[in-house]
Amino acid sequence: GYEDAAPIILQGHMDMVCEKTPDCDKNMDEDGLDLEVNGDFISAKGTTLGGDDGIAVAYALAILDDDSIAHPRLEFVCTVSEEVGMEGASSIDVSMLKGKKLLNMDSEEEGIMLASCAGGCSSRVTLKLDKNKVTGTKLSITLSGLTGGHSGVEIDKGRGNANVLMSRILRDVITDNNVYLAAFNGGRKDNAIPRECMAEIIVAADKTAEVKAAIENAAKEIKEEFATSDADLKCVVDISEGCSTEAVTYEDSTRAVSLIQALPNGIMRMSQDIDNLVETSLNLGVISLDESGICLRFSLRSSVGAALKNLKSQIKFISEAFRANAEFTGEYPAWEYKKDSKLRDDMVRIFEQMYGKKPTIEAIHAGVECGILAGKIEGLDCISMGPDIFDIHTTEEHLSISSTKRMYEYILNVIACK
């Protein structure tokens, strides 16, 4: 009875953010996950779960595999590289698709549906640094135990960014001492708030105690400041005497740390139109120091095109002031709210019938592939939804089993709607 019904597109992405705890030796490119069930929740031991967005793939495959389900023509769009700039959605050829209604299954809160999202891009700031052979005491500094999280959805939680906090510690010791930067690495993804960061500095032997005390004092202040949002934050300093190694010159060490401190991070502006919605933000997700210099990778987001343009200019001008280079890639459009949406109206009505209450329709400060696909398919009507998934992009990620079952039944009712 669905021969004349309009087709529906089911959509999600198959890649995941691959985070793991420091003591996990799993190869995230090759090894499977060790799944755990604790009550109503499923998680992965020592790693991210990949419910974002493996659940969409699971939903779609289950529906396609079940011949007993009544539905119109279904089209399943499964993209790659969503977590690194939505490259799959940007590159996909949509000419074969016939559907004008798209159900995106990349949201993480049952009962909250998305009808609009921010646009954004990635930024890569590189600074060439000179190195010399230096001898002295090596202090290895490790910041760990931060909460982390998704750099869009959880940027408003006030959580510490390990990369930014490490640069703050280094700022306090470099400005008052002859310190050489030997290593600086933190974070794995530009769109995840980094939970850990490691740095190594070389100091004169007679300055060791003074510098160590300065590090510990800075760390103490940070722990007090972030006691609520990052209760498990810890800073460890290991000392190795009599080290002779290549390290960044004092002048360039100062310049690198000053650049990081000068560049913005976090919320830039709240929405003027929607209460409690972040309009513009950025996240310093990755820092890496190698033979050529230091590289900073940011994720930028905004629901206002002019604000994103201004933020890019700000990063560019600050970088150039420190003789660094800023590049921007992977820009994706914002998904604008559609005033008239039959799909949204149907989904609200079906949800109310099943749950006895209306769902919440929201905009989100994060990238959703709906914006890119809506720009490719004229007249596309999109809604994003999903089951309860908590702490995505972190090793604490966990998925509600009962919510997953309820939302599956909900999806079946949505696709059965003519």
What are the roles of these predicted feature ranges?
Residues 95, 159-176, 203-208, 254-261, ...:
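His/Asp/Glu-rich mid-to-C-terminal helical/loop segments that flank catalytic regions of hydrolases
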Residues 132-136, 155-185, 192, 205-281:
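Acidic-enriched catalytic cores of C-N bond-cleaving enzymes acting on peptides and small amides
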Residues 71-162, 170, 174:
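Fold-level recognition of mixed alpha/beta catalytic cores in primary-metabolism enzymes, strongest
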